[in-house]
Regions:
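Binuclear metal-dependent hydrolase catalytic cores
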Residues: 1-138
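DG-centered beta-turn motif at the end of beta-strands
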Residues: 140-142
Length: 168
């Protein structure tokens, strides 16, 4: 799973699954942010396979509404360490900055409104809503719908121009 939203001077990538290798990171021209819906293999495995990570060392901010920055750092550094991956990605690519989710909102302030909601998925997951100039996109990845979510999801998605929802 990997989706990209480009708005004005900001590039937002949601999850870095296998499709991430096709994303042209344009961070010399735009602020680049990666946010994760959750941390299952199919949503993080492509991070190291994007060639643009290795040719420009402008900062890329990485975050998730699902957990704090320390937990996210622990998850990604464990996955991309010498134990499970042939290179220690975060020690080699110092421009990958793991930050608290509120730091992403500060960066995006005035550019795009970003909000999140908790989803049902083993290990947890969160959905995101992106709003700008009256238009909105909602992403709900791997949500395992249950009736007790109905009202919250109706409110979170209300008025959205596009809802991307895949479920199990």
């Amino acid at each position: 799973s990997c989706y990209e939203i480009e708005i004005d001077d900001c590039q937002i990538v949601i999850d870095t699954g296998t499709g991430f290798h096709n994303v042209e990171l344009v961070r010399k021209k735009k602020d680049t942010v990666i946010i994760y819906s959750h941390f299952h293999h199919d949503h993080i495995q492509g991070l190291s396979f994007n060639k643009y990570l290795y040719d420009d060392f402008s900062p890329i901010l990485i975050s998730s509404a699902l957990c704090n920055a320390n937990t996210l750092k622990e998850i990604l550094e464990t996955y991309y360490s010498g134990h499970y991956f042939p290179i220690d990605l975060f020690n080699q690519l110092k421009h990958l900055k793991i930050v608290e989710f509120n730091e992403i909102n500060k960066l995006l302030e005035g550019k795009i409104k970003l909000s999140s909601t908790k989803l049902r998925h083993p290990g947890g997951a969160c959905g995101y809503r992106f709003e700008k100039n009256g238009a909105s996109i909602v992403t709900l990845f791997d949500n395992e719908y249950h009736d007790d979510q109905k009202q919250d999801l109706i409110e979170f998605c209300e008025g959205a121009d596009l809802v991307v929802w895949d479920g199990m």
